[in-house]
Amino acid sequence: MANRPAASALAGARSPSERQEPREPEVAPPGGDHVFCRKVSGVMVLSSDPPGPAAYRISDSSFVQCGSNCSMIIDGDVARGHLRDLEGATSTGAFVAISNVAAGGDGRTAVVALGGTSGPSATTSVGTQTSGEFLHGNPRTPEPQGPQAVPPPPPPPFPWGHECCARRDARGGAEKDVGAAESWSDGPSSDSETEDSDSSDEDTGSGSETLSRSSSIWAAGATDDDDSDSDSRSDDSVQPDVVVRRRWSDGPAPVAFPKPRRPGDSPGNPGLGAGTGPGSATDPRASADSDSAAHAAAPQADVAPVLDSQPTVGTDPGYPVPLELTPENAEAVARFLGDAVDREPALMLEYFCRCAREESKRVPPRTFGSAPRLTEDDFGLLNYALAEMRRLCLDLPPVPPNAYTPYHLREYATRLVNGFKPLVRRSARLYRILGILVHLRIRTREASFEEWMRSKEVDLDFGLTERLREHEAQLMILAQALNPYDCLIHSTPNTLVERGLQSALKYEEFYLKRFGGHYMESVFQMYTRIAGFLACRATRGMRHIALGRQGSWWEMFKFFFHRLYDHQIVPSTPAMLNLGTRNYYTSSCYLVNPQATTNQATLRAITGNVSAILARNGGIGLCMQAFNDASPGTASIMPALKVLDSLVAAHNKQSTRPTGACVYLEPWHSDVRAVLRMKGVLAGEEAQRCDNIFSALWMPDLFFKRLIRHLDGEKNVTWSLFDRDTSMSLADFHGEEFEKLYEHLEAMGFGETIPIQDLAYAIVRSAATTGSPFIMFKDAVNRHYIYDTQGAAIAGSNLCTEIVHPSSKRSSGVCNLGSVNLARCVSRRTFDFGMLRDAVQACVLMVNIMIDSTLQPTPQCARGHDNLRSMGIGMQGLHTACLKMGLDLESAEFRDLNTHIAEVMLLAAMKTSNALCVRGARPFSHFKRSMYRAGRFHWERFSNASPRYEGEWEMLRQSMMKHGLRNSQFIALMPTAASAQISDVSEGFAPLFTNLFSKVTRDGETLRPNTLLLKELERTFGGKRLLDAMDGLEAKQWSVAQALPCLDPAHPLRRFKTAFDYDQELLIDLCADRAPYVDHSQSMTLYVTEKADGTLPASTLVRLLVHAYKRGLKTGMYYCKVRKATNSGVFAGDDNIVCTSCAL
């Protein structure tokens, strides 16, 4: 609509004959009147209408429907005088039409009478906040409104008006709005308005300009139909405001606040003249209460000297002090605002923002050497967070006057996070906002780029430092482009600050380096370190693959940076911590097989090879099969394992990144029963207890063949245990060769024979009680390896059971990891396979750079690493992607998507590895020995494999046979427990463990809700039904299936199942569907639930393990997690050890 005049309250409403036709809405100029309210307490209508600003109180604001501490717009002005409630609509008096335009709400109109008004009525439209927007007022160009009405009687004093009203300049100037930085004045549109303006000028002695205060993020241009004020009783007459985005600090929206009474003869304020108008000192109608309120609003006497002491700094007429952040100025403004900050917690932020803006005009552009300082954008980001929290009706503490310093701003953010953290269990919005506050807290500990690059604790690579200096200007521009506040203002995607509280805390507590005593590298600096190093070490062939040409360092930097910062690709934890530094240890997984046969040799291997790996925080899979010299009544391996247990505990005690070790044995080892009893309550005596290490069984097919015979009803099925003297060759063979040798030893009467069900029960009991042993299938691993291992069979895996490598006394298996975030590939419920291919390609290039540049802790590790160049590209967020697409893991659509994703990942990874060889890189050392040399693929050994990209596979086959592959193995599906937290997605390929993750530590409770579920609940329920639904979920451990059993099977909420709600055989089948395209293995956890009586039948786990064996998996069980029958949580084994190496 065209700009309409501000309707003078003294000018009555136009008659129906004078109404004009509605006009098209248009953006109004900045400015406008505000209404502030506090929950359902009184509402103050503030007018900037000449001849003098005045405030009018609406005593009952229940009809406003505006929530807590909202900022609303008045499209026009209101009549001078007192507004009081009107029970019924009448045709006399002034009206205030208040429109509720919140999302989903219908417009509502409240009619309020203007006391003592004798002229026609006038209306004022008040628009509340729209969903997702925070509104600032916009003024209207004055327009003649008819004859002036007789001034109304003076209003009675309003209790809180003095606290948010305008303040008079400390030197006696005109009264200004709090926080105003610019003046605004509408030219008179009629003689009567001109006279009023002149009269106002005489009263105040400083002109008729009015200034505004605002503390919200968004600006709005209010629109109204020209005839909307003709009938305030009609809902249809109230039109929503048109929202115009602008930065909250770009300038105020004009608002005139009521003049406080100022003592004209006060010795403490010698230059202050007496105010005029209702409630002023010269107004004989002012009451004693009004006088007291006005006096309380006056600045203190010590404000003026502050002004005089800083003559070179610009002074904002809305504040009694210069726009310079000093303790004296901040305290003066705090006294100036008084108790108003209790109603408007962010009131101090506008002063901080104005000061920061003034400072930015004086400082040069940011460089590497620029000292970190809080900027206008930082205060704006905090203000955005506070405004969002106020929309949630939270009672916020006021921003302290010293919060302009990094330390006190950090303390204030911490107070908010700790205070409201428990509420994130029911609010996805609050979960996101608290994450923003943690990122702001990180910002307060940021150092300059120069300090960061020179830090000994960070210890940047020399070559990287030189490259960063060469591109200083570009990096500063990129840093500003990724400013979170700018991204919020311009609706630019910034997934970093959108990921939520857990993501931000994980960055702060774990991934960001500390240096210089109290500094912390920023998230931008961390990803600059990683991407910059990758760009430095990228070869010419890699640049051609990534960019399609020979690009520059800066182009390669951006290629990696954006995919890392956006979490399309995620490095492993050691890579994220060490890439770009001179600590070049980035490998995650180590497979060690010392083949020691004596106690002394085993101890040397543990204290030498194993200890060196632990010192570099590597996760270890240790094969102990060869050490098997038990004598009757003793366990040969347990003393050595006790040494290993103590060694792991010692390394983890002072480490910020704990690691672990897993001991692999075959089930015929003479000490297998002792190992199954070495953890937790199963440990018979302290000398046998090993709570800091894990165990895993390397199961041959023969064991399950016999177990199935027992389950089918066959009697007296046995299993034999052998010691070293009779079993030296068993570990070297697999398949039929192993079975022949094993049965031959039995036939000769060697070994100890036990019922097979006894050992099966011991395995299941240990798994259900301690979470381990892990179970891997020896024959499946060796059967699908890239070359024949008969006679030197692979004897173990890594700590998390997803890496497949041969290892021996001379060579240890080593793998470098990375993962792709599948949830980032979903857009509008569609999976983008093009983005997936791009992410896998980038991940393969990243891991190859890691392989080229990493150091190894031992010669054995270096030998195995260089010979095979093995990588493990994993996935995270599979379940999150499924939910974002509106699918269920049980659906046929997802079963197809699951296989499709796995095939694309392997295809893209192998094509990239082959492209490196095409561009001149040498194939891995054992390529000619591998099945790839003959043109065979991993998936071709699976009868259920049906690739959909047969043409691409055939082209790759020909190129692979001609040029080779740079890497020996590609896809390994690890848990991604740590990195999934900073991505804020589900771990690996597993379903969500729970819809509300809760962990209590000495630092408090950590909560991570399923935000997709919370949003779906809000779409489904409302009001009390929503609260009831969440109460039910709380009572049922956030299991939708148990809390809301009455939902229709097709209801969208039915999709939000936890891992325990799914049939575990289905999860095994999903792993089997992916298996042809996973050339390493999958860390498959089983989730089982106790029966109502608190028991867990052994047959439950046995049945699942047999099913995994029959489906041909390599990993039968990583963890076994048990949901207790009572509401006491989930037992997942001993969590004193957290693998952050292989688990990413």
Swiss-Prot record:
Residues 141-159 have a biased composition (Pro residues). GO terms for biological process: deoxyribonucleotide biosynthetic process; DNA replication; release from viral latency; symbiont-mediated suppression of host apoptosis. Residues 119-132 have a biased composition (Polar residues). It catalyses: a 2'-deoxyribonucleoside 5'-diphosphate + [thioredoxin]-disulfide + H2O = a ribonucleoside 5'-diphosphate + [thioredoxin]-dithiol. Keywords: ATP-binding, Disulfide bond, DNA replication, Early protein, Host-virus interaction, Inhibition of host caspases by virus, Modulation of host cell apoptosis by virus, Nucleotide-binding, Oxidoreductase, Viral latency, Viral reactivation from latency. Residues 205-216, 279-305 have a biased composition (Low complexity). The record marks 589, 815 as: Important for hydrogen atom transfer. Substrate binds at residues 573, 588-589, 619, 798-802, 975-979. Its EC number is 1.17.4.1. Disulfide bonds join 589-815. GO terms for molecular function: ATP binding; ribonucleoside-diphosphate reductase activity, thioredoxin disulfide as acceptor. A motif (RIP homotypic interaction motif (RHIM)) lies at residues 55-75. It is an enzyme of class 1 (oxidoreductase). Residues 192-204 have a biased composition (Acidic residues). Residues 16-26, 164-179 have a biased composition (Basic and acidic residues). The active site is at 798 (proton acceptor), 800 (cysteine radical intermediate), 802 (proton acceptor). The record marks 1139, 1142 as: Interacts with thioredoxin/glutaredoxin. It comes from the Viruses. Residues 1-33, 118-324 are annotated as: Disordered. Ribonucleoside-diphosphate reductase holoenzyme that provides the precursors necessary for viral DNA synthesis. Allows virus growth in non-dividing cells, as well as reactivation from latency in infected hosts. Catalyzes the biosynthesis of deoxyribonucleotides from the corresponding ribonucleotides. The N-terminal region confers antiapoptotic activity in differentiated cells such as neurons and is important for viral reactivation to increase neural survivability. Prevents host necroptosis by targeting host RIPK1 and RIPK3, thereby hampering the formation of necroptotic RIPK1-RIPK3 complexes. Belongs to the ribonucleoside diphosphate reductase large chain family. PANTHER family: RIBONUCLEOSIDE-DIPHOSPHATE REDUCTASE LARGE CHAIN, RIBONUCLEOSIDE-DIPHOSPHATE REDUCTASE LARGE SUBUNIT. NCBIfam families: NrdE_NrdA. The RIP homotypic interaction motif/RHIM may drive self-assembly into homomeric amyloid structures and mediates interaction with the RHIM motif of host proteins RIPK3 and ZBP1 to form heteromeric amyloid structures. This is Ribonucleoside-diphosphate reductase large subunit. It comes from Human herpesvirus 2 (strain 333) (HHV-2).
